[in-house]
Amino acid sequence: MFDIGVNLTSSQFAKDRDDVVACAFDAGVNGLLITGTNLRESQQAQKLARQYSSCWSTAGVHPHDSSQWQAATEEAIIELAAQPEVVAIGECGLDFNRNFSTPEEQERAFVAQLRIAADLNMPVFMHCRDAHERFMTLLEPWLDKLPGAVLHCFTGTREEMQACVAHGIYIGITGWVCDERRGLELRELLPLIPAEKLLIETDAPYLLPRDLTPKPSSRRNEPAHLPHILQRIAHWRGEDAAWLAATTDANVKTLFGIAF
């Protein structure tokens, strides 16, 4: 099983990053996609992907950091995307929940990254929170120019999920679905996601599954917890976990064009 969203550049992994990666593979994870959320972290993600086997990375600027976007950023992302470890542009998108960057800054950076991905024929790794309508309005003109797209860490509604799938967008599901307080709506729509459009991820070190036992004392999520998330998703979808792991692995290979 492949974890499509690991924030391995996080300072929470600074002291034991090697062990975190080793534990993930020991647990049955067979590949990691390391998320780039700004230029510096995208550069670090690429270096980590080169350092560890069966790891790849994204290059992009998260909506929170969109105020940093400028011509030099764009040039650096394009240069970074030429590295073989980098297999997607992002994390890019819109987040109108907290607006760490203004909506205008977010939209400018998002469209610029969609253009880069289209020009380079690379898939996009996307983020959307409290911005679905505007997100789709900006994205739709680019979809026929992109080889693929995934909306990672999906936490939206049934209607939003169906709109994404209708446009061929992959849906990334995290341990959010294991949260009995805020993940129930997502849990209910799991069976509606076509298996050929489903991807799984931890978003580590964030979103530690609430039903994980025993819980780590650090409360830090790790890619080694992906098998737990997979098992729960398979249970709620009424599918065999091994079949779902193989299916989502095939989806990863199709979307990102990688072999593992």
Swiss-Prot record:
Single GO term (MF): single-stranded DNA 3'-5' DNA exonuclease activity
Record's subcellular location: Cytoplasm
Inducing or repressing factors: Constitutively expressed.
Enzyme Commission number(s): 3.1.11.-, 3.1.13.-
GO cellular component terms attached to this protein's record: cytoplasm; cytosol
Binding site for a divalent metal cation: 91, 127, 152
Summary of the knockout phenotype: Knockout cells are less resistant to the DNA damaging agent H(2)O(2).
TM region(s), chain numbering: none
Entry's Gene Ontology BP terms: response to hydrogen peroxide
UniProt KW keywords: Cytoplasm, Exonuclease, Hydrolase, Magnesium, Manganese, Metal-binding, Nuclease
Main location, first listed in the record: cytoplasm
Keyword Hydrolase in record: yes
PANTHER family: DEOXYRIBONUCLEASE TATDN1, TATD FAMILY DEOXYRIBONUCLEASE
Matches recorded under HAMAP family: TatD_exonuclease
Family of the protein in this entry: Belongs to the metallo-dependent hydrolases superfamily. TatD-type hydrolase family. TatD subfamily.
Assembly behavior: Monomer.
Protein's UniProt name: 3'-5' ssDNA/RNA exonuclease TatD
Biological classification of the source: Bacteria, Pseudomonadati, Pseudomonadota, Gammaproteobacteria, Enterobacterales
Gene: tatD
